[in-house]
Amino acid sequence: VGTVLKDEPLYKHTTYRVGGPAKLFIKVQNVDELIEVIKYCRKHRIQLFVIGRGSNLLFSDKSFEGIIISLEDMNQYHVNGSEVTAQCGVTMIKLAYDCAKIGLSGFEFMGGIPGNIGGGIFMNAGAYKSCLSEVVKKWLNYLKMKWIFHIDILSFKTILNGLSWKLLLFWKIKVLKKLMKL
């Protein structure tokens, strides 16, 4: 079930560097591990909290007695033509730069946004008058295990674990120049 850390200080996993220890901190690497941990927590009525890279999160300095599930290691993506499919732990900065390198346009605004794609989708992250809802085609919701299209509304209990985009193909030099202007 991924990497399990006991009494892990949460300040190590947030951009604000605050937070006390979590009784258990589990880094999952794929959907099967994520499902296994969530089912375990539900079966045993254990409080759980899902995080990505910890940007825009504030944890109490008191101990968290439940399980923190980190999606940070779910960081694989692949490109098929102009369509990008990514796990939720891919960082927005990495995806923006990697897409620019191969001439895909549409993610340039993410070039300076901390955090990962899953959290970015959840809060509709954006910059430079663009946001993720403008480029996301669909996402995979753990609770329903089906693809949901971007016109649907996310509930607070939604756990994103996969995303897909349709981008525009441009000459690499144009995309890189646009990215460098940001």
What is each PLM-predicted segment?
Residues L5-K6, K12-V18, L57, N141-L182:
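Phosphate/pyrophosphate- and phosphate-bearing ligand-binding catalytic cores of soluble enzymes
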Residues E8, E33-E36, E72, E83, ...:
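Glutamate identity and glutamate-enriched acidic tracts
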Residues Y16, F25, I46-L48, F109, ...:
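Broad hydrophobic/π-residue packing in well-ordered secondary structure
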